[in-house]
Swiss-Prot record:
<feature type="transmembrane region" description="Helical">
    <location>
        <begin position="163"/>
        <end position="183"/>
    </location>
</feature>
<feature type="transmembrane region" description="Helical">
    <location>
        <begin position="300"/>
        <end position="320"/>
    </location>
</feature>
<feature type="transmembrane region" description="Helical">
    <location>
        <begin position="136"/>
        <end position="156"/>
    </location>
</feature>
<dbReference type="InterPro" id="IPR004638">
    <property type="entry name" value="EmrB-like"/>
</dbReference>
<dbReference type="GO" id="GO:0005886">
    <property type="term" value="C:plasma membrane"/>
</dbReference>
<feature type="transmembrane region" description="Helical">
    <location>
        <begin position="200"/>
        <end position="220"/>
    </location>
</feature>
<feature type="transmembrane region" description="Helical">
    <location>
        <begin position="6"/>
        <end position="26"/>
    </location>
</feature>
<dbReference type="GO" id="GO:0022857">
    <property type="term" value="F:transmembrane transporter activity"/>
</dbReference>
<dbReference type="GO" id="GO:0046677">
    <property type="term" value="P:response to antibiotic"/>
</dbReference>
<keyword id="KW-0813">Transport</keyword>
<feature type="transmembrane region" description="Helical">
    <location>
        <begin position="223"/>
        <end position="243"/>
    </location>
</feature>
<dbReference type="InterPro" id="IPR036259">
    <property type="entry name" value="MFS_trans_sf"/>
</dbReference>
<feature type="transmembrane region" description="Helical">
    <location>
        <begin position="352"/>
        <end position="372"/>
    </location>
</feature>
<keyword id="KW-0472">Membrane</keyword>
<keyword id="KW-1003">Cell membrane</keyword>
<comment type="similarity">
    <text>Belongs to the major facilitator superfamily. EmrB family.</text>
</comment>
<protein>
    <recommendedName>
        <fullName>Multidrug resistance protein Stp</fullName>
    </recommendedName>
</protein>
């Protein structure tokens, strides 16, 4: 490994490190962000969802543009956009600016994630050196995923929530310098053309759906605004499907979904990310807003999830090579559902049960992600593997975005329906009760200060904070039950239709990914799920 190769490895590894660091670091800062901008559950959902939404709508187009116009160029664009977005997040004067800046971070993250490994692969043409380089590259990225929650908690406790974004600035500057000076350009001369119409329709469809789901509990599911957005999403999706089926260079080749195994693998991976990212959002809020933990302690509490994914992931490939993909997928889904059920029934009990539940969720995710990738990539012809991998990447981001939106909205809807009636005995005055319920819901915090609204002498029978905490816990339980139910559906579908004989060698799978999309076989967007060892025959 010469000096240029080493610096290329550092530049690409640090870029991915930043992307993975931001996957979970924001969650522990949400209560502080809420207090700064006085926003409710919907505002917090936008802060976390806008990042994954930016990745979801742009990741496939970013890969095409990188293949067409140069991966180094688009890596620089991605890092620059991500770094500028981080600056804007840190300086944000309002929740709207913060949400927009998070979306810009997501767009930059999409470009970085689909170009990073391709640049490493181009810098190390010899097979053994390439394998060693990818191992180092994944190790650098893994550090970011496993330390994200803990580092985020420490930064928030010491310097406030804005510091979690400023930490990206020195790294971004270093990555830009190293890339400009040492990373060589590469591209794909056979790349397909950029599908602008498909990209725009995809943005409209996904964006309108996410907007309707997040804002629905606040503005009403039957409001004109919500109905218009739902219709916009439906029409946009229909037009997208119609256009992509007729395009000679589609952004998303929908004919791949004719294969039952591939379609089910995509549905499964989307559902896993839906459940897990929604769970992480709700668990973080529970630990800080209900249990009253500091950001630092919350970050440590989340660590078992990331650690379990990082530890189990490298071991799963060997298991797939020996017994196939079906059993690990189903076992992983069962373990993930068990972890969610443990979280559902652990709120009033010890923190140890929460830690065990998070560890089970992480182990379940790690156990099923690699075999899902195996099923998906062996179900398609080798010449279409890049497209298949890109769709899988987009569905991961879409799943996490919808998870933030749907499960957060379930909590908000539950509170809107139950909190005020449950406060009736504690706060008999209807005006005070309504105002108090609105404050608690809008602050997304059952510990919101109530003294100025309801004087202590007007409180009867029970403390409103205790009632609000119980409603928050019940709302989180309902949301996690929704996540568990969706996993149960894909588990039953997988039991029926997942193939029983998928044993794919790493060399065979790696040969299927010749484009910038190769990043998907080494890096999952799940925090902590970074690996480089492909399974043996």
């Amino acid at each position: 490994m010469n000096r240029t190769q080493l610096l290329t490895l550092i530049a690409t590894g640090l870029g991915l490190f930043m992307i993975f660091l931001d996957a979970l670091i924001v969650n522990v800062a949400l209560p502080d962000i809420q207090r700064s901008f006085a926003v409710g559950e919907d505002g917090l959902q936008w802060v976390v969802a806008s990042y994954s939404l930016g990745m979801a709508v742009f990741i496939m187009s970013a890969a095409t543009l990188a293949d067409l116009y140069g991966r180094r160029r688009w890596y620089l664009i991605g890092v620059s956009l991500f770094t500028l977005g981080s600056i804007a997040c840190g300086l944000a004067p309002s929740i709207a600016v913060l949400t927009t800046a998070r979306g810009a971070q997501g767009l930059g993250a999409a470009a970085v994630s689909v170009t990073s490994l391709a640049l490493v692969s181009a810098a190390f043409p010899e097979a053994k050196e390439k394998a060693r380089a990818i191992g180092i590259w994944t190790a650098i990225a893994s550090i970011g995923t496993t330390t994200g929650p803990t580092l985020g908690g420490l930064l928030v406790d010491q310097w406030g929530w804005r510091s979690i974004f400023y930490v990206n600035l020195p790294m971004g500057a270093l990555v830009l310098f190293l890339t400009l000076c040492y990373v060589e350009e590469s591209c794909n001369e056979r790349a397909r053309r950029f599908d602008l119409s498909g990209q725009l329709l995809f943005i409209v469809a996904v964006g309108a759906l996410v907007y309707a789901v997040i804002e629905g509990p606040q503005i009403g599911w039957t409001s004109v605004q919500t109905i218009v957005m739902l219709w916009t999403a439906a029409v946009g999706c229909a037009l997208f499907v119609w256009l992509e089926r007729r395009s000679s260079n589609p952004m998303m080749d929908l004919t791949l979904f004719r294969d039952t195994s591939y379609a089910l693998a995509i549905a499964t991976i989307c559902t896993v990310f839906f459940a897990v990212y929604g769970m992480l959002l709700l668990t973080t809020q529970f630990l800080q807003n209900v249990r009253g933990y500091t950001p630092s302690v919350t970050g440590l509490m989340i660590l078992p999830f990331s650690a379990a994914v990082a530890i189990v992931s490298p071991l799963v490939g060997h298991l797939v090579g020996r017994i196939g993909a079906r059993v690990p997928i189903l076992a992983g889904l069962c373990m993930l559902m068990l972890g969610l059920l443990m979280l559902i029934f652990s709120e009033h009990r010890s923190s140890a049960l929460v830690l065990v539940g998070l560890g089970l969720c992480g182990s379940g995710v790690a156990l099923c992600l690699t075999p899902i990738t195996t099923v998906a990539m062996t179900a398609v012809p080798a010449e279409r593997a890049g497209m298949a991998s890109g769709i899988m990447s987009a569905q991961r981001a879409i799943g996490s975005t919808i998870g933030f939106a749907v499960l957060g909205s379930v909590l908000a809807a539950w509170l809107s329906a139950t909190l005020e009636p449950h406060l009736e005995r504690a706060v008999p005055d209807p005006v005070q009760r309504h105002v108090l319920a609105e404050i608690i819901i809008d602050s997304a915090n059952p510990r919101a200060h109530v003294g100025g609204i309801v004087p202590r002498r007007h409180i009867e029978h029970r403390d409103p904070v205790a009632i609000a905490e119980e409603d928050f816990i019940e709302g989180i339980r309902v949301a996690l039950l929704v996540a568990t139910a969706t996993l149960a559906v894909v588990f039953l579908a997988g039991w029926r239709w997942f193939p029983r004989d998928v044993h794919t060698a790493g060399s065979d799978l790696s040969e299927r990914l010749p484009t910038a999309m190769t990043v998907e076989c080494a890096v999952s967007h799940m925090p902590g799920a970074t690996w480089c060892r492909l399974w043996p025959a």
